[in-house]
Amino acid sequence: MDKLILSELTNGLNTVWMLLAAMLVFFMQPGFALVEAGFTRVKNTANILMKNFVDFMFGSLLYWFIGFGLMFGAGGFIGMPHFFDLSFYDGGGLPTEGFLVFQTVFCATAATIVSGAMAERTKFSMYLVYTIFISVLIYPVSGHWTWGGGWLMNGEAGSFMMETFGTTFHDFAGSTIVHSVGGWIALVGAAILGPRIGKYGKDGKSRAIPGHNLTIAALGVFILWFGWFLSLIHI
């Protein structure tokens, strides 16, 4: 009986801690929005803010619809889709719905990282297409390789990781699954789009394009610090 009570108490505390971390990561969304809006020109503020809303609004539904199954379903390279069905997942004592929320906010974070790198030169409709791809394919598949128990986490004898490196891959605090994925996509997007109009003169020298509000940009940075460092304690 004592072990049962202790187990239930542990699961309850773990659930509270997981949801607290999810709320902190979600709180990073307004941080990203403020940073990006503050460092861009006032005429593009509405576009930047709307893209951050779209990341979460559409991304959360799409991730729930198909992304969660691809990330945590059975399979080595990619999981099996389970459309709006969470019954396949065993949370190990944690509620599956809570874990879905936890993963959803990380998916939104990976998507939002790209927004700032392509600010002021991306059509809203094309950004919506990108949001769909990262929410239902890019983040879930790369996440399945590690957090979903895919081939990078396969520690069985004879597996690729064990034969090649003698150990499995370890992702610390989403440094690869979240930030590296978002960063690489941002790099590719910025390279394809090129610089903002007016950034370089005819002589090739760069011109400063100051943001319209450094105050809200600084506030956004502090919000990001707050959300990231406190959620890092959980991860």
Question: What does each of the following model-derived ranges do?
Answer:
Residues 1-233:
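Hydrophobic alpha-helical transmembrane bundles of multi-pass membrane proteins
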